[in-house]
Curated annotation (Swiss-Prot):
Main localization category: virion
InterPro entries: Flu_M2
Intravirion face residues: 44-97
Subunit-structure text: Homotetramer; composed of two disulfide-linked dimers held together by non-covalent interactions. May interact with matrix protein 1.
Residues covalently joined to lipid (S-palmitoyl cysteine): 50
Annotated protein name in UniProt: Matrix protein 2
Species per Swiss-Prot/TrEMBL record: Influenza A virus (strain A/Chicken/Hong Kong/37.4/2002 H5N1 genotype X2)
Stretches the record annotates as Disordered: 61-80
Role of this protein: Forms a proton-selective ion channel that is necessary for the efficient release of the viral genome during virus entry. After attaching to the cell surface, the virion enters the cell by endocytosis. Acidification of the endosome triggers M2 ion channel activity.
Amino acid sequence: MSLLTEVETLTRNGWECRCSDSSDPLVVAASIIGILHLILWILDRLFFKCIYRRFKYGLKRGPSTEGVPESMREEYRQEQQNAVDVDDGHFVNIELE
């Protein structure tokens, strides 16, 4: 069974195009999948930076501090801040929440 929906054949009058029955369920399903794939590809290209930045940075919210005493949380924040505050002339201070 062929998935071709359009066939060009040589006739006496020249080249003609004979289309097969487009109500074939396989042809309809392939068309729908093709259109959805094209739409998703276009959206991916348009929103590439937003989507992948969200996956890369948005889902990483750092280690959980649930059940950790406040003093240890503050110590962790201070360590993170010290790692950033190497040289105030070249680095921007980042306030951790």
